[in-house]
Amino acid sequence: MRPPWYPLHTPSLASPLLFLLLSLLGGGARAEGREDPQLLVRVRGGQLRGIRLKAPGGPVSAFLGIPFAEPPVGSRRFMPPEPKRPWSGILDATTFQNVCYQYVDTLYPGFEGTEMWNPNRELSEDCLYLNVWTPYPRPTSPTPVLIWIYGGGFYSGASSLDVYDGRFLAQVEGTVLVSMNYRVGTFGFLALPGSREAPGNVGLLDQRLALQWVQENIAAFGGDPMSVTLFGESAGAASVGMHILSLPSRSLFHRAVLQSGTPNGPWATVSAGEARRRATLLARLVGCPPGGAGGNDTELISCLRTRPAQDLVDHEWHVLPQESIFRFSFVPVVDGDFLSDTPDALINTGDFQDLQVLVGVVKDEGSYFLVYGVPGFSKDNESLISRAQFLAGVRIGVPQASDLAAEAVVLHYTDWLHPEDPAHLRDAMSAVVGDHNVVCPVAQLAGRLAAQGARVYAYIFEHRASTLTWPLWMGVPHGYEIEFIFGLPLDPSLNYTVEERIFAQRLMQYWTNFARTGDPNDPRDSKSPRWPPYTTAAQQYVSLNLKPLEVRRGLRAQTCAFWNRFLPKLLSATDTLDEAERQWKAEFHRWSSYMVHWKNQFDHYSKQERCSDL
């Protein structure tokens, strides 16, 4: 997904040949030896020099790698960010800076479907930089601002990825676009709640500091600090939701877009106790003393600060409590500070009268995750699984489920006319993971926000890109609407179809209309189908594909009633069972499985008998 005219592809930007190339492309920061005033901006920290970039419709200005915090290294590891001190002279902001230290996906080396999400700059703990794209020349009147927060399970991600290129939205829609790096994994979310040395949620605090920077400085770029929209996908969307729920963040933005993620998802937060368990286990794994009641938190964190960054990353995944997918080791913690209560409680009691929110999902939210640990799944075959593999997959996909709850999931998702059909079992496994982690939390959030006064719009994205390299059985996977929202199909070198280019332009208009007015519809367009608000009564949402908008009702309503209403009650009930009753139910479960096995064997025997009679 890297256009050949992309002038910031590699860190080696100092070569004379590259500067010559940039000059030929019209991308240099200077013209005939003079500074281009459009590329010089003064912010509170000092002066910046940006770069002019080409986009298919004309040039844009980009200011890349702007420091907004002091490097969180040494004694600042695990600590809240500190604002960047002023600098002297003109700071070069013509190239992306380091990516925050993180896990790198090596499951399919060289495969574009995984490599596109891997870091494309040097890994470093010195990584708190942000980027600004504006139309060229800069807007003369205040322009709405879009702030992107990347996803990656809170363990990975970078604002410099090619799929997050802000030039298209800036050039085509005339907006100001901002993205930032924030700390992930151990460095952003390791927590010993109550301690000063590692309070937790510092990755979210990185994001908040970037939002504060935007409020203080974006007017210098032509942006309107009074019209700021947050948008993010997956963990980025969950982050957006947490800023909605965190009072100190609420004054820093005005609208929010949550793509395929929510703060109330089962993977998005952990309790203070679980966060401490994971932190102390990581410490033990890397040879540091325990903290808490059995030790000293200060000693534990002091020791962890001496460990190489890669050593911490290498041990991150070993702290999860059970085998699972769509669960991540270090995530936001309910700390009583950034999150004063659980997301569910804050959503239920919040006042959202002044909020406009756009939320949605893609068609096949679960498929991407199956190749990362569910038995029988691979990108290199059709992943036609057996019933035994499906049953094992349910335990991995819903790791918190009791035996009875897992049986309920199996019951709900089995096609009882064809209970052994491999293709159905594959698709059912994808639906289990997607519904549980994304679709039904999104539906729940949309309903609760709408009930409490927010203006909500909802969608399902259904188009599979013609350039997608993942296998057909994956459908429209998690994350693959992003390239259309950012307008990548407008670049002819990327080989999208004409229809996809038109589709991308339509989506860009919906998102920027929402950023301007809180409504994705164009007030000047009376002919196109209207996108209605989502209400608790009508539950209307739209399908986004190559066809005109289609309005539907009830986003997987029956299935989400199972996840959002029935299953929590079942889990609560089974939590109160005494041990004898638990054992009885476990025996009953084994007996049921035995009877199913006996019936299958009997049916097989009966068929053989009939065949022998012929």
Swiss-Prot record:
Its EC number is 3.1.1.7. Has been found in central nervous system and muscle. Found in embryonic liver and spleen but not in adult liver. The active site is at 234 (acyl-ester intermediate), 365 (charge relay system), 478 (charge relay system). One of its GO terms (biological process) is acetylcholine receptor signaling pathway. The keyword Repeat does not apply. It holds the Pfam family COesterase. Keywords: Cell membrane, Disulfide bond, Glycoprotein, GPI-anchor, Hydrolase, Lipoprotein, Membrane, Neurotransmitter degradation, Secreted, Serine esterase, Signal, Synapse. It is an enzyme of class 3 (hydrolase). Glycans are attached at residues 296, 381, 495. Its main location: other. It comes from the Eukaryota. Disulfide bonds join 100-127, 288-303, 440-560. It is a peripheral membrane protein. InterPro entries: AB_hydrolase_fold, AChE-related_enzymes, AChE_tetra, CarbesteraseB, Carboxylesterase_B_AS, Carboxylesterase_B_CS, Cholinesterase. GO terms for molecular function: acetylcholine binding; acetylcholinesterase activity; cholinesterase activity; collagen binding; hydrolase activity; identical protein binding; laminin binding; protein homodimerization activity. GO terms for cellular component: axon; basement membrane; cell surface; dendrite; endoplasmic reticulum lumen; extracellular region; extracellular space; Golgi apparatus. The keyword Lipoprotein applies. It is found in: Synapse; Secreted; Cell membrane. Residues 1-31 form the signal peptide. Homotetramer; composed of disulfide-linked homodimers. Catalytic forms H (GPI-anchor dimer) and T (asymmetric collagen-tailed), which differ in their C-terminus, account for all types of known ACHE forms. Interacts with PRIMA1. The interaction with PRIMA1 is required to anchor it to the basal lamina of cells and organize into tetramers. Terminates signal transduction at the neuromuscular junction by rapid hydrolysis of the acetylcholine released into the synaptic cleft. Belongs to the type-B carboxylesterase/lipase family. This is Acetylcholinesterase. The lineage of its organism: Eukaryota, Metazoa, Chordata, Craniata, Vertebrata. The gene is Ache.
